[in-house]
Each structure stands twice: as C-alpha cells, then as structure tokens.
Amino acid sequence: MIIFTSICANYVHKARTLAQSVKQNIPDAKMILCLVEREIPPAIYGPYFDDVILAKDVWPGNFDRFIFKHSIVEASTAVKGHFFRYLMDRYQDENKFIYLDPDIYVYSDFKELREQLENSPIVLCPHLLKPGNIDMELSSTAHGVYNLGFLGISRSEEGRKCIDWWADRLYLFCYDNIQKGIFTDQKWFDLVPCFFDAEVFKHHGYDFAPWSLLNCNIEKKESAYYIEGDPLRFIHFSGLGYSAEKCMKDWLPEGEHPFKELYAQYKLIHDANDSDSISKTPWSYARYRSGELIDDEIRIGYRSN
C-alpha cells in the first residue's frame, strides 16, 4: 500500500507528524512525500518518509509555467492528480494508493479501507454524514461535498480513468475561486460518483475532523477511541488553532472530552516537530529567480491568457 501527501516546505512539520503516525500504525505502507519546491531542504530527510520527490521532477511538461498560475494554497493540491498517476506507474507491484492531507494523524490500521479497496476502484469520504446544520451544508456545497484530504484508489481501469480525468481538470482549473464554482482540487470530485464507480465511504472512524464534532459522538474505551461506535482510524486536524478550537468551544461541553484529549496530544507532537520555525519557511515559487515577489494579480493575469 502506498500512502502519500503533497506539501510546500512550510508544511514539513505537519507531513512529518503524519508520517510518524503512518509508520507507527501501518508499518507495511510506503510513505511518500510530494514536495512543491525548487529544491529539497536538508531538514526534510528522516526515518519516516520512504521517498521525497519534487513535483517538478516528475511533471510531464513545463512545470515552471504550470506552477506560475497558482498561489501557495493551490499549488500542493494542483499536482495531486498527476502524482497519483506517477505513483501508479512507478510502483507496479502496489495495488492500493491513498492520499492523506499533511494535517492528518493516523491512530490505527486501515482495516476497513483495505477491504473496501479490494472491491471498489475509488473510495472517498463526504464532509458530512448527517443532515441538520444548514451552515455546514452550505459550506459543503461551496467547497465540495467530499473532503479531498483523503482519497483511496485501487489499481483498476476505472480508478485510472478517474485519476486521468481529475489530473486533466486540475491542469486547467485548480484555483481557489468559489465564485466560479472551483475550490482547488476538491470541488471537481462532486462529479466523480456521477462519472465513475465510486464508493462513498461512511465509516465514522475515517476523516473525523473538527467539523464532525457537531453531530458525532466520540468515546474512549480503555485505550481505544470510537466514533458513533466505529473504531477511530484517523483524525483530520484541519484548522489547527483558532478554527478547530472554535469548533470545540461551540460544540463540545465544558470539561474533559475525548476529542480535547486527542487534540492536545496531537498538538504536542505537531509542535515538537519544529512547527514554529518551519511554518515560516518561504515558498521557493513565490518569487522570480531574481528574488522579486510575484504579485497575485500577475498570476491571475497569466492563467487567463
């Protein structure tokens, strides 16, 4: 099984935290890092990544022209489709390919997902599993029904068709432009269950996130955690800091709570990975080679031509 994440250098600490959790809980998985930078910084190497690959080194065309169209927010998502293709071509003996966002932490082996990928070419998780909060539902319609912080693809004709289609769309349109119906790589996947044989995975223990706290019961039994009775597999710590803590304040009771415990534990590990200094790392594609900063309006004008 191949697990990969895609980042710019300012997220190395998050990717390292993810990789640690993968190696601890899914030791048979290969953990691959796709890095959207001009060079690999020495600090990135360590025992948790099986390989670190620059996106530009496996890109089929002119990467500088492609990446010039994108902001740092868009960049690491814009390469995901092609990187799936690259991994499927490179690792011919592997049949399961999983993308995880860098701000995810794995708590146990992906038993159910392994089984699902034996029967389904595409496995995706929706943001919401229950109706009830109209603000959350509106947000989901704007940003994407499915959370692309996770995606599972099996080696199959259908899975490859989906990845090829997605990669082609991201090559042309992977922007943060909700007004035009685009939200990076994610909004495209609203169409995937219409076009392809995709499994909407409704196991509560996968892709649990701060936005899940409103409608999900989480409990601890001995040393294990359960979401609506399903064993916890991974948490997506999206919005670490203000956003996640606001969700906890608004939706959790005062006092002790299993999610608060998990959040505090994750933050300790995350911060121990040199988060304060790494998060300030400048993006190497933010400037011309002369050193001059590239204005966002220049990027937008370039993409429109």
Predicted stretch roles:
Residues 1-305:
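Glycosyltransferase catalytic domains, chiefly GT-A lineage
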